[in-house]
């Protein structure tokens, strides 16, 4: 085990503070509408240009071990806030720096750090309770667009696209972000349930121009095994032909005689039919087939539950208003499943999402959920260069997370104003002894985001803070326009969840750093190769002589 270096008390705290300051100072230049960019060198490709706090924080590693501890702890604040709320990483970093910096001064002056931490915790608890009071539920499309715009660094186009996507697929719908081939950022939506399996034969196509098989008021046969023998399907096909309605067959595979017969019937016009493979693999395939069955009001014809294909009847088939199948995807629109069954299935999938530990499984479950309740929207991000595309895509993802957070917990005035309003809630706290110092630290730290937004906009932070503190609840400083106004009316709003997470995560880590009395790190290793150049010339001739003797 290698030797360790230990630092105690003030020595340890001042080194941690130095690390915290280096990381926070690099991150906080990005805060607010007039925040600056940070350029990050990478070992491959072009440098990354970003205004995203967490991207800057993740790149920082300091050479000095004890300083690096401070930087890594604040990086944890930014990452956790990003994971929980999707935005607010820079605010969280600025708050953590403010709480720790003020706290270190008091601990150095001889105050008890444990009591200070208790005071910080109680102050944050009171502030969070006041935030919930201040919070208003999101009302309309316009407010969703405003939240998206603020999170995307005041890019109105992104805000509008995200609001439109949420309107189209609902609050539960899946919205994904992809890189576009063109310069423009656009939105594509898929209504109904879409899965990534196309027609098994181009002879099923009904619209030759678009190479699509389109079926109106269709029936759906869902089977979990391969179909290769036509005899198994004769009964059900005859029953469907009598109804005179189109039929979609979804099975593990359809091949040989069965596929050939379906194609011949389709070409002769005897039966309007199309066949696709079942989506997914293994257990996920079974679950997706069950989803399709519930959505369309049909049953999965499976021997596992006692249904054989040759005994299938019309009432086992699903129904849908419209089905569109192209070479790669099938879309079922307006299935005839009962609302009660669909909601039951949705509840079941939500429970699985809560329980699963795997990110991949969670993503797949969320996709299934979206297909049942709303649909899927894809935001295609376009830009002139790859560097701009990456930066823009990160902003779109931030904006998307923030709008989801706003829908979840509501909104508060933005621009650091909500935290300023929480100060009066914690001023009324009456705590014993040194805990009051903890309250004072939080009061001072809550001004920091507004100070930094003002400083980045070229204004004097202290003057702005005083002016805003004297105003009404929603009164604040619009840094983009350099004026004081009603923040809600100006569309400068933050999701409550983002502000809450930033404050809680910052105080949690800063409080732990304050109560640190010793730090341990590995000693830097001595370079072992110092004596080698001198040793080699002396060693080699002897060795060579030995070899000569052997020969």
Swiss-Prot record:
UniProt entry tagged with the keyword Chloroplast: no
The UniProt record lists the keyword Transit peptide: no
Any one cellular-component term (Gene Ontology): cytoplasm
Main localization category: cytoplasm
Reaction(s) the record says it catalyses: ATP + H2O + a folded polypeptide = ADP + phosphate + an unfolded polypeptide
EC number assigned by the record: 5.6.1.7
GO BP terms, alphabetized: protein refolding
Any one GO molecular-function label of the UniProt entry: unfolded protein binding
CDD domains listed in its UniProt record: GroEL (cd03344)
Cellular compartment(s): Cytoplasm
Binding site for ATP: 30-33, 51, 87-91, 415, 478-480, 494
Enzyme class: isomerase
Record key words, sorted: ATP-binding, Chaperone, Cytoplasm, Isomerase, Nucleotide-binding
Assembly mode: Forms a cylinder of 14 subunits composed of two heptameric rings stacked back-to-back. Interacts with the co-chaperonin GroES.
Role, per record: Together with its co-chaperonin GroES, plays an essential role in assisting protein folding. The GroEL-GroES system forms a nano-cage that allows encapsulation of the non-native substrate proteins and provides a physical environment optimized to promote and accelerate protein folding.
NCBIfam families documented for this protein: GroEL, PRK00013.1, PRK12849.1, PRK12850.1, PRK12851.1
Family from the record: Belongs to the chaperonin (HSP60) family.
Name by which UniProt lists this protein: Chaperonin GroEL
Taxonomic lineage from the root: Bacteria, Pseudomonadati, Thermodesulfobacteriota, Desulfuromonadia, Desulfuromonadales
